[in-house]
Every structure is written in C-alpha cells, then in structure tokens.
Amino acid sequence: MSEPTTTPSIRIGTAPDSWGVWFPDDPKQVPWERFLDEVVASGYEWIELGPYGYLPTDPNQLADELGSRGLKLSAGTVFTGFHKGDDQWKRAWDQALDIAGLVSKLGAEHLVVIPDLWRSDATSEVLEARTLDDEQWAKLAAGHDRLGKALLEEFGIKQQFHSHADSHVGTTREVERFLAETDERYTNLCLDTGHFSYYGGDNLKLIDDHPSRIGYLHLKQVDTSLLFDVLKNDVPFAEAVTQDIMVEPPHGVPDLGPVIEAVAKIDSEIFAIVEQDMYGCSIDRPFPIAKRTREHIFGETAAARVS
C-alpha cells in the first residue's frame, strides 16, 4: 500500500498592521492588549512584533503576555536607508540591537527590513528622488549584506528585505536588481504580495524565478479598481491606505492560495503573515476582517496551517 501524500503547508499568522497599527503610540490605534486578545479570538497563534514600542519591550513581560494567550512571535521590523551613505549603519544597527535583541529572546528567527520611503508616510512630503543612481544602488546592496551578516552572527536572525510602495525598491525591475546585487547568504525577501502587486509585479513568477530568495511572506491584496487611479493621480501610499487600497481578501489581487502553495513547496518553515494595511481605521473594524480573512485563506488552500 502506498503512503498517503501530505500537502506541503506553511504557518499563517497576523500582525499589528492588520489592526491599523503603524506607530508605537498613536491614539487612533487599538490598545495592544485588545490587539492580542483579538488575535487569539481570530484563530491565529503567530504574530509579528509590529512597531517597536507598541507591544511591551521587556522580554519577560512580552513572553508572559504572549504565553498566557498561546501566542508566538515570528519576526520584528526595522527601517533602513543604506542608499544614503555609510552614516546609516549606526541607525540600522541601533534598531537591530533593540529589536533583534528582543525577538531573538522570544524565539523569533527573522527581521523584516523595510527601506526608507522617498515620500513620507506621515506627511506625504516628497523627501528625495524616486530612483537611485548606480552608486546609491551599490550602497544599498552593501549595507543590507552587512546587516544580514551581522544579524546572523550576533543573533542567529535572518534578514528579510521588504519591497514597498513609495520606496526605491518596488517594481519588478527594482526587486530583480536588488536580488542580483545582494548575497543570498545574508539578504533575502519578505515577499509582500500586496506591495509587489502595487506596481504590477507577478508574485508567482517571482517565486518561480527566485525560490531560494523567498524567506518570508506578507499576505495582502491590492484593489486594482482603485490602484490605477492611485498611480495615475500620484496619490501617496499613506493616503491610498485610507482609501482601502489594500483590500480585504478575496476582493483584490493576487489570489493568496496559489502563492501560499508555491511557497510551501519551497520550504514548510517559511512564515506567511497576514498584513492588511489599515492605518487610520476605526478600532472596531479590524477584528471581523481578521476573522473573515483567516477563514478565506484556510478555505482556499490546504497549504495553510495555524502552527
């Protein structure tokens, strides 16, 4: 008798971002205790740290708060601007010491690294040119490889680079160049399905072309009926978020089931974190969306698992 086949699967978690949390402290945002309670009620076991300072930063307190709810931590997040020059190293490493230092004590093995935006997500002010020159690209790549190497050596943490709307690495061509100029031993991708689709990226093709560079997933969908207006009228990403550019599944692109299945075939230890950008929403809105999104994902594919 042949052995039954097992469908490869990956862990599905969520993040403060799906509750509208972008900043450590903001009166518009849901209190952190309520966030954790609603995560549990939504059926998730894995979360990201979110902005440093939103959840408790004392490792013992955070471990108690998560453990009492049966929750576990998959990653933290830092922001970098290596294309600006060597002076950016201290800023990046100071963040890493705090954030990687915290999450590693709770068993997390990943750090999601987001590049500085050329347009402010707080004020929508244009801060710098939209594209990088060759020298800036070289600084960007070298900085991330240095960071990834240091994270591995100091904390056993893997760097997962997150391309982003309104950043210098967003389009397919830009992501491909970033991969070509960085070392996969130290720098790989947190593939955010919504941000990559924001500029027309084909998530499945990227996964197929670069399976060894996919280290982490953020699951979200972009509303294409709104996207073309956003791009045509040069609407800042932060403003587009308030218009629900990142839409509740299944009302956008890409289809999440095929993405999850493709990544599960690469490595069943990869995390897929649901991350629907909702900053500025009412505090009562995220919870029902989180429940429906989880139900949608688990109804769409057998390659999703809770733990």
Label each region the model flagged.
Residues W46, H110, Y216, I270-F271:
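Residues at the N-termini of beta-strands
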Residues I273-Y279:
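Short acidic/histidine-rich active-site segments
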Residues S9, T14, W46-I47, A141-V253, ...:
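Acidic/histidine-rich catalytic cores of soluble enzymes
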Residues F23-P27, W46-Q61, G81-A92, A165-T171, ...:
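Acidic-and-aromatic substrate-binding clefts and catalytic sites of carbohydrate-active enzymes
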Residues M1-H110, D134, A138, D145-R146, ...:
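N-terminal pre-domain/capping segments
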Residues D26-P31, L117-V126, L226-E239:
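Short, flexible, mixed-charge acidic loops at enzyme active sites
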Residues P250-K265:
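A short, acidic, amphipathic alpha-helical segment used as a generic capping/interface helix at domain edges
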Residues E3, Q88-L189, R285:
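Active-site acidic/histidine proton-transfer and metal-coordination neighborhood
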